[in-house]
Amino acid sequence: LLDESNYSEKREQTDLADAGWPSNGYALFSISCYSGGNRHGVFHPFMESNCLVVRKETIFSIGGADERFDMPGGGALNLYIYRKLASRSETVVFVLAGEGSFHQQHGGVTTSPVEAREAKLIRQRDQLNSFLEAPFKSPCIDPILLGKIPGSAMNYLKFSCESGLNRLQRFQEQGRDPYEDEKNKTPLKNGGF
């Protein structure tokens, strides 16, 4: 993972310039890392997703984008929507394991190294938990992997496999299902898919 104490927007701009990504987008893997929210790779539960492809009816069936999320940047709305959608029986989570979602430093609410960042995250967590009426938990569901894995992404897949196997072993030793939420999914309201 990224050592945030040694990272800045200036360093990021230098890394991007050196990576040569305009001629090969996959070169971004050479300067990337897993995000803090999904730091264990693709075989661990995700907190959120930066790309959701769903029908309008499906979004409506979970109440849409809840406008009570009134904190800067939308607060934890992304986590809320992902949790609600992933918990539905008709929802299938696909992961493009050879692709990435690259988030740059830009002064955003939760990614900026500011003194009050931790306090903001606590307020967002508290608001999310109150709307869910329970502590937030990443949905533990089986991901379906799609797509090719370019050579530049192989180390990420290797890390994901190793981390996923460690998780699987830990759950087996505890007699638990690593994808326990899969069997507890709830039907969508109003049809949806």
Walk through the language-model features, giving the residues of each.
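A conserved catalytic-core signature of glycosyltransferases
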Residues: M47-S49, V53-R55, F60, D66, ...
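Intrinsic-disorder/low-complexity peptide segments enriched for small residues
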Residues: T14, S163-N166, T186
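Exposed boundary/loop context
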Residues: V42, E57, V93, N184-K185
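Conserved catalytic core of nucleotide-sugar-dependent glycosyltransferases
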Residues: L1-L52, F60
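C-terminal catalytic/acceptor-binding lobe
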Residues: R68-D181
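Positively charged N-terminal leader segments that act as targeting/secretion signals
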Residues: K185-F193
